[in-house]
Amino acid sequence: MSRHTRIERYRNIGIMAHIDAGKTTLTERVLFFTGRIHSVGEVHDGATEMDWLPQEKQRGITITSAATTAFWQPRQGMGAGVPHRINVLDTPGHVDFTIEVERSLRVLDGAVAVFDASQGVEPQSEAVWRQADRYNVPRIAFINKMDKVGADFAMSVASIQARLGARPVAVQWPLGAGSEFRGLVDLVRMRAVMFDGEDGSFVDGQAVPEAVRAEVEAQRLRLIEACADEDATVLEKFVDGRLEDITAEDLERALRSGALARTLVPVLCGSAFKKKGVQMLLDAIVNYLPAPSDMPAVEGFVPGKEERVSRPVSDSGPPCALAFKLMSDKAVGGIVFLRVYSGTLRAGTVLLNPATGRRERVGRLMFMHANRREEVAEVHAGDICAALGLKGVRTGDTLCDPAEPVVLESLGVMEPVVQLAVEARSPAELTKLEDGLHRLAAEDPSLRVGVDPESGQVLLSGMGELHLEVVVDRLRTEHGVEARVGQPKVAWRDTLRRQVRQEYRHVRQSGGPGQYAYVVLDVGPAPRGAGLVFTDDTRGGTIPKELVPAIEKGVAGAMARGVRDGVPLVDVEVRLLDGDTHVRDSTPQAFAVAGSLALQAAAHRAGVQQLEPVMEVEVTTPEEYLGEVLGDLAARRGRVLGMEARGVVRLVSARVPMASLFGYVTGLRGRTQGRAQASMRLGAYEPVPEALQASYAAEARA
């Protein structure tokens, strides 16, 4: 069966922003204007389509990315008059749920970055922008909340350039702001669009008001200058001084070219809540963001080889898909979200999972609308879908044709910063607790579940207090487990203080087959954030190449277990210098043990340095509370990096140890009568000051 929509009419997009910038509200309006829903729900009422988890409705925030599909026929531009399929992922804005943004951006072709017009670029909007940079995702920007007090379009655009290093290009200019926001000027066509009422209706084709004509013409000249850098036709007309000959089609072609090359970012404006500017944004999604066929062929490598291969977008190519999200459903079991890069999948298609070596048979295929399902017979290259029947698949796994295997780039791993202990209230609930945590950890790669080696307690590690609070709440609501929960603690790390050379000989002669392994390692600290840097510097084949991965595996296992109090060891450089084998007793298992014990012995000799997570904090506060905010940050061992005025408030940037930040946001609201706000994200792991190491080491053992 052929696809219903041609691939060039697909748009796979995400909506991303800082918390409270209006992502979910914008998504609701997109669904409304595309006819996907017939009435809009509001975030503050807990009635939105895309925030379907009970925790999302209760808290008024997005926790998990939600997928849906809509169709839009642009009024104008290159896609005018032709229905386009838009697959939308609405992503969280809270830093604790940044893994949802990470995995969404990994599989999307384009994104809409939403900014609060009164704030411009905020901390988490900067974080998600960097994530989009990592995956080379083309973007357009939507300056939202133009009807809000303090809205400033020019400031917001300037902040995109100053803080994100991007080249924002305004394709619209607002007429008024705050309560006076009444319309906008389409700079591409040089005509005004006046909003008419609260239902999203507008009057197009109006003359540009004389009061703003000079400013608007200056902005259009900037637009033309930016487009001249992207398109030869625009450049020729611009250089010749024939500005009146530059058509809307010329500018749209240049804007699309620049957006796809990520050399510029088209910027639009509006008010999602008031339904203003949303239809023009939908036109821009079609006209400026790429189809799957516009993107480079996805690349991977052949399992077990260094050979790079590509998979062009083609329905007739070998099936290739990436599992980017898992979800449990009581009615149907495990649901695996897939981005199909090539080929066609049907119920019964057999796929290889190179990560496990297992073959998986596709059960049913579905398109999702939040938590609702639409079953389909087949899916094609470019589709974002969900599948049942895939038993052994994890987030980040590739599923491919067994005859033409390939492994695609997986997802980035995020280091947790907070942990807490949980335990079942009764022995009868222990199995339910373990099963529930196993399912939640399978869904959420940023959630780590471990066991305290001394107390035997189950430890949850995550991205923040709210993250773990939601996990515990989901244990109760989805798995029926009322767990006892300890106080949140810092997720400490250790690293090595100095470099040492370590020999280790592992010999076992009794109790079954013999084991023999001898290794000589050079072990020392690696640059911060490097993880394990392992190199094989042996000469003359003293250790066969097939045994070297076992040594690395043993070293990695010892680092994960840590050398004191179960605290993981990070950022270690290991050079394998020499070794020895026995013709019969030298097995991969023996060398894994030798690598593990050699690393532990080296760490005890080198000494360990305790590391703590240090957060990048931004506080927005009225001027009258600035002194109190700064004093409190200093008392928490914070280092103020800078301050800037944002209208009537001050923005304070600081780096503060996570150990000093438990309960900070709640306390800040109390001290400022609810008028100050704070956000934070992990900056880096840094050494604990010598004066605090003894007390923090005791806390790590507690």
Curated annotation (Swiss-Prot):
Q: Which residues form the tr-type G domain?
A: 8-293
Localisation: Cytoplasm
Q: Which residues form a coiled coil?
A: none
Entry keyword annotation includes Ribonucleoprotein: no
List S-S links within the chain: none
InterPro entries hit by this protein: EFG_II (IPR041095), EFG_III (IPR009022), EFG_III/V (IPR035647), EFG_V (IPR035649), EFG_V-like (IPR000640), EFTu-like_2 (IPR004161), G_TR_CS (IPR031157), P-loop_NTPase (IPR027417)
Listed binding positions for GTP are: 17-24, 90-94, 144-147
What are the UniProt keywords, alphabetically? Cytoplasm, Elongation factor, GTP-binding, Nucleotide-binding, Protein biosynthesis
| Cellular component aspect of the GO annotation | cytoplasm
Pfam families, alphabetized: EFG_C, EFG_III, EFG_IV, GTP_EFTU, GTP_EFTU_D2
Q: What does the record give under GO molecular function?
A: GTP binding; GTPase activity; translation elongation factor activity
**Database matches in SMART domains:** EFG_C (SM00838), EFG_IV (SM00889)
Q: Name one GO biological process term.
A: ribosome disassembly
This molecule's function is given as: Catalyzes the GTP-dependent ribosomal translocation step during translation elongation. During this step, the ribosome changes from the pre-translocational (PRE) to the post-translocational (POST) state as the newly formed A-site-bound peptidyl-tRNA and P-site-bound deacylated tRNA move to the P and E sites, respectively. Catalyzes the coordinated movement of the two tRNA molecules, the mRNA and conformational changes in the ribosome.
Entry-linked NCBIfam families:
EF-G, PRK12740.1-5, small_GTP
Give the family, as the similarity comment puts it: Belongs to the TRAFAC class translation factor GTPase superfamily. Classic translation factor GTPase family. EF-G/EF-2 subfamily.
Q: Could you tell me which PANTHER family the record lists for this protein?
A: RIBOSOME-RELEASING FACTOR 2, MITOCHONDRIAL, TRANSLATION ELONGATION FACTOR G-RELATED
Q: What is this protein called?
A: Elongation factor G 3
